[in-house]
Amino acid sequence: VVAVVAIGLLWGGQRRRAFGLHAYAAAFLALSALGGGFATTIAKSLVGRPRPPWNGVWSYEPTSSYPSAHSQGGITVWVALGLIALVLVPGRVRWVISIPLLVLGPVIGVSRAVLGVHWSSDVLGGWSLGGAWMAMSAVIIVLIATGAARRRNESSDPPA
């Protein structure tokens, strides 16, 4: 999903002559999703918390329980896509696209607790890690974008 959407953002930005904004959105999505997954993998290996005893009734997961990777991914992928839609999609359509994405992220986490493959604290940990990683990704992309804009402005200034 991330790769397809990132390619679509780049292609759409090129067609609309808004390549820079779309490229930053694609970079934000990639950094948020891939980095969040990496951070969750590290956290799972460090914590090593066992799954609830009812794991396997509805679904079985062999890895550690904390933090919930699905909860983290719901935030770093689906909520990130919803935020991108709020910025890039024009008009009222932005709400039709972004609201389901913004709701889907947290719902994924709730479903993991309902299925019995996570404790509720695993879900909260996944949401927290995902939200923190997504926010950090946004800050990094904004710093890169403002630095690039500053360099463009400095290079276009006439010499004194």
List the predicted regions and their residue ranges.
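Membrane-embedded catalytic cores of phosphoryl/pyrophosphoryl-handling enzymes
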Residues: A6-G8, N55-A160
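Hydrophobic alpha-helical bundle signature of multipass membrane enzymes
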Residues: V1-S64, A80-L83, V87, G91, ...
